[in-house]
Amino acid sequence: MQVQGFFDRLTGRNKEAWKEGRIRGTAVLVKKDVLGLGDFHASLLDGVHNILGHKEGVAFRLVSATARDPSNGGRGKLGKPAHLEELVVTMKSTAAGESVFRVAFEWDESQGIPGAVVVTNSNRSEFFLKTLTLDGVPGKGTVVFVANSWIYPADNYQYERVFFANDTYLPSKMPAPLIPYRQEELNILRGDGKIGPYKEHDRIYRYDYYNDLGQPDKGSKLVRPVLGGSQELPYPRRGRTGRAPTKTDPNTESRLPLLDLNIYVPRDERFGHLKMSDFLGYSLKAIVEGVLPIIRTYVDTTPKEFDSFQDIMELYEGGLKVANASALAEIKKRVPFELIKSLLPVAGDQVLKLPLPHVIKEDKFAWRTDEEFAREMLAGVNPVMIKRLTNFPAKSTLDPNVYGDHTSKITEAHIKHNMEGLTVQNALKGNRLFILDHHDHFMPFLDKINKLDGNFIYASRTILLLKDDGTLKPLAIELSLPHPDGQQHGAVSKVYTPANTGVESQIWQLAKAYASVNDSAWHQLISHWLNTHAVIEPFVIATNRQLSVVHPVHKLLSPHYRDTMNINALARQTLINADGIFEKTVFPGKYALEMSSVVYKNWKFTEQALPVDLVKRGVAVPDPTSPYNVRLLIKDYPYAVDGLVIWWAIERWVGEYLAIYYPNDGVLRGDEELQAWWKEVREVGHGDLKDQDWWPKMDTVQELTRACTIIIWIASALHAAVNFGQYPYAGFLPNRPTVSRRPMPEPGTEEYAKLERGGDEADLVFIHTITSQFQTILGISLIEILSKHSSDEVYLGQRDTPEWTSDAKALDAFKRFGSRLVDIENRIKDMNGNSALKNRNGPVKMPYMLLYPNTSDVTKEKGQGLTAMGIPNSISI
């Protein structure tokens, strides 16, 4: 009673009966501090003080969806302002920091049914409004306004903050009194004509080129080309920040200081969902300010190489010990030590101790087997590259007039003894030969790349045989370099084949490592960054600019955009920037993003559909009798098997949902917002490819269903498949090295003699050939963070707000989607327990769970942290 009395006095009122002509409501707000790195469990009284300010500090005015005001241009009638009243003290579970307030509105039936609310913040600080719920609305019952938005003091805006009820309307179906509000809100978000620089409170979605990666004002070494806006270096667009150009180059945007993570994204795109998500930016900052000095302190007091595999294991079993106490003290001053402690557990003087990667948890040596090397092409962190070999020897797509002949040097003589009784021609006809081909990817860049300090990179081809038991075995690896007399002369190549004993077995291990270096770089640069993060951002921007929040397609896609603009902005600031962590740890170095631009020239939106991709790579063939319309040629291909059923579930959900609003193609063609959205995606967001003939015309519901399925697939399942296995597979870097620094040892050299002697000496040759000690520690410190699920993760088949729509048909369809995903979870667990499916676990005994939806984990208890499982809705890390 004392607490209630405090609130009564604070709000200047006592509890009183609800009067006639009033609508009761509850508003859920979150104070500013809770979504930062302060006290996550701020006290209730602090929450009231920070949110309420004074009793009229937050005002709500309802807008009628059915009654027009002739004196206000026919807009919906506006109700009188209502203010936050007493805070609801409840023992029910509310998220940390949430406060629930009562609100009472003067409203009668003559004003019709509320369809929007205008919110005004007269306080000094912003707050986060989650929802406003009205009960007992005449003629309607319950009305829910889902805001999920930061509301700043009113003097920051030149417009009113308007939120719509959770009803869904095509533009032609929008209640007339609300149409002006719908149009004005879209104009505000477009911000056309507002060049910036944009402020923290801004909500502007505009496009820009990738022109903010370099720092020409700091010298030529930090100059990077502008990506996007040209045929030479095309690229998807990113969100505009409005920052000024550099002094040296007017085409390059100036950058914030490295450790300033307040790079502009529209306010509601910023991490505001707390805990691990919001913590990510600070973790990256901790790496730069905390981990780098620790690593340098460590490597400066020891040789700059690991001395053995046990030396590497010490990262997980013993940790790094910092001998220089003063250096550690300085680090503690520069970064709040709690951050480093949370990021990297501290035990005594063991400052950096990393969790044991899944790939070596059960067996420390199984990663070295040929079986595991091949299996990871089907169930590893980059399972999207393997292709069926259709010609032997393998052909090149490089222009022979420029590059000469790059036909593979692998001959039948190299592999016939290992073909399990098959001839090459029989194996080709029987769909038994496959290839991991990075030759053409890297060859045009190798001259430049190998001039970078510390690099000796080959372009690789790996040929594999599909065995009778459904597993793959490598037959040969071809390593190639540009011809010393010029690229027009083709390549200088050497072929290596499997061996189990002697120096040949050591050479074979190195050959696999060189091939893995290629695959690691391609994975990070193309499979991960370009094909998920970069290509999705234009859809995020276009959706917010052209589709109202009440549009059915906006409601369908918005969960799959959560945090994407923010993580991409942080990537530009600290990861893919000039001399950033990516350039420090992966071999293409400063040419990395330029390479990804060349690859983007051949990107096709329609080929991102999983069934299309599998057929294109030759690992599946069309089959109209299959529910997925394709049949896999590698039956035990975990990524494809799980991916196809996930794809099917997404496509079915999207089809059922869109059918509610688009009963025929004519309705779709007449949807002006949808048509403007697709036009902008094609002509602006992916504008460098706008003239390609593969773009869907967006004339049919089928085209929209396929397009939305592709968008959701990329943002959820594809990203999960290539992201959350990073630390589990590559956290032990010998399994997935990112750099090779020395050529393959040749007979007569000291390195070759060490390989002949075997044992520790041979191990050292391997260790000193791959990623350096500094690069290893920095790289795996980063991917540990990037492989973690946040504590507030929202998985496929879940929504962060249960009241995301008022449409019962849509809610029922979504429930069916969730049920299908839970069935898929059980199916995946059953397959992982089937010993006949050898690729599901492999020699390392690591079940393939990267496409396990984790929809059933509503408490988020199973899915938090480094789990190597779960499909989040969006690219949020």
Swiss-Prot record:
**The protein's required cofactors:** Fe cation
Q: Which Gene3D superfamilies match?
A: 3.10.450.60, Lipoxygenase-1, Domain 2, Lipoxygenase-1, Domain 3, Lipoxygenase-1, Domain 5, PLAT/LH2 domain
Paste the cofactor note.
Binds 1 Fe cation per subunit. Iron is tightly bound.
Every PLAT domain range: 38-165
- EC numbers for this chain: 1.13.11.58
Instruction: Give GO terms for biological process.
Output: fatty acid biosynthetic process; lipid oxidation; oxylipin biosynthetic process
* Domain Lipoxygenase, first and last residues per copy: 168-877
Question: In terms of domain of life, where is this protein from?
Answer: Eukaryota
Hey, which pathway is this one from?
Answer: Lipid metabolism; oxylipin biosynthesis
PROSITE patterns annotated for this entry? LIPOXYGENASE_1 (PS00711), LIPOXYGENASE_2 (PS00081), LIPOXYGENASE_3 (PS51393), PLAT (PS50095)
**Residues reported in the UniProt entry to bind Fe cation:** H528, H533, H719, N723, I877
CDD domains reported in the protein's UniProt record: PLAT_LH2
The entry sums up its family as follows:
Belongs to the lipoxygenase family.
Protein name stated in the entry: Probable linoleate 9S-lipoxygenase 4
Q: Which organism is it from?
A: Oryza sativa subsp. japonica (Rice)
The record lists the lineage as: Eukaryota, Viridiplantae, Streptophyta, Embryophyta, Tracheophyta
